[in-house]
Amino acid sequence: MTTRIDTKFAELKAEGRPALVTYFMGGDPDLETALKVMKALPKAGADVIELGMPFSDPMADGPAIQAAGLRALNAGQTLAKTLYMAAEFRKEDDTTPIVMMGYYNPIYVYGVERFLTDAKASGVDGLIVVDLPSEMDAELCIPAMKAGINFIRLTTPTTDDKRLPKVLHNSSGFVYYVSMNGITGAAIADTAKVGEAVRHIKKSTDLPICVGFGVKTPEQAAAIATHADGVVVGTAIVNAIAGELDEKGKVKGDPVAAATRLVHALAESVRATRLEAAQ
């Protein structure tokens, strides 16, 4: 099984540069605006799109992403509408990978088999489900693999050598290394330690390793890019969108322009870093 994720990372490896993986919340601040943001991300420099599935109890997310999820839910976003976003995006872009990220509850309520069928039909390439450990692979991971959808695992600084093989077992697409303990949007990690961790994980897998949590600026993204196959940025993009909304969460400025400006700057920085390192 070769997915768009596999193809994209193979292309980037051939180019000698890491991926910029961009996260935003589906339906934030509303469906129409969020879809415009999604469609604009690849042109701004995003290599992979993480599409957030809003959920009412997002335990791993910091205040910014929690607020984005709440705005989306208040605007009527559902899992079906998030899948619709993927399908609409695919009408214009058949190459940029889409990874849906969130929690298991909405998928369980939707129905696993129905969800995987609809996700595949909508052009979704991968899943990150933060509250499903490897011990529960039979719930979603293995059915996703059978449906041709990558299942991407999170590893953390506390994932020890005993735990790591279990985390990597049945993983596909890429490995998401959470560069610190805590919630999304926390402070940036020590880049030297990140490099050490990535090298350690690479001893156990051939999958690309992307690093996220705490990456907010182009400079931070560049620092992480020297150590990883990809850099994940989420909270900063969500904040850029939020900065264009009024106190009620409605659009007052231009969230699409704000998000794409940031992504363009991040992409320029990430791409330049690897090129400099290769010279």
Swiss-Prot record:
It comes from the Bacteria. Keywords: Amino-acid biosynthesis, Aromatic amino acid biosynthesis, Lyase, Tryptophan biosynthesis. Pathway: Amino-acid biosynthesis; L-tryptophan biosynthesis; L-tryptophan from chorismate: step 5/5. Its EC number is 4.2.1.20. Belongs to the TrpA family. Tetramer of two alpha and two beta chains. It holds the Pfam family Trp_syntA. This is Tryptophan synthase alpha chain. It catalyses: (1S,2R)-1-C-(indol-3-yl)glycerol 3-phosphate + L-serine = D-glyceraldehyde 3-phosphate + L-tryptophan + H2O. The active site is at E50, D61. InterPro entries: Aldolase_TIM, RibuloseP-bd_barrel, Trp_synthase_alpha_AS, Trp_synthase_suA. One of its GO terms (cellular component) is cytosol. GO terms for molecular function: tryptophan synthase activity. The alpha subunit is responsible for the aldol cleavage of indoleglycerol phosphate to indole and glyceraldehyde 3-phosphate. It comes from Brucella canis (strain ATCC 23365 / NCTC 10854 / RM-666).
